[in-house]
Amino acid sequence: MCYIIFMTKSPFVNKDKIQENQFAFAIYDAFPVSKGHSLIVPKRIVSSVFDLDDEEYNNIFLLVRDVKKILFDKFKPDAFNIGINNGTDAGQTIDHAHIHIIPRYKGDLKDPRGGVRNILPDNTGYIK
């Protein structure tokens, strides 16, 4: 990976890092949906998490686990959502893959059942 290219082309630069490893870093989301909402960002610029090689993919998800522990210790959430918007039609607005870690707190939604299933409101019921 060319560090200079990464530093000039990524919208995630110049952010305080929560944690990092050889393959990715974690930052707080600039537009958080909850206290502690964070992003895991691959150091190699790829549009999709499906473009990561196995070593990157595995180590990035190890970082997800490490950051979850940091967020739990700092913010004491009751649960977490982990999300990836992969492609424009899935809501991806930045052409650099990243993973959302969203701390959840008891009472932040009246009925949190279904979690990520609620991204398509007309299809939130379980298929019978």
Q: For the regions a protein language model found, what residue spans apply to each?
A:
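HIT superfamily nucleotide-processing domains
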Residues: 1-128
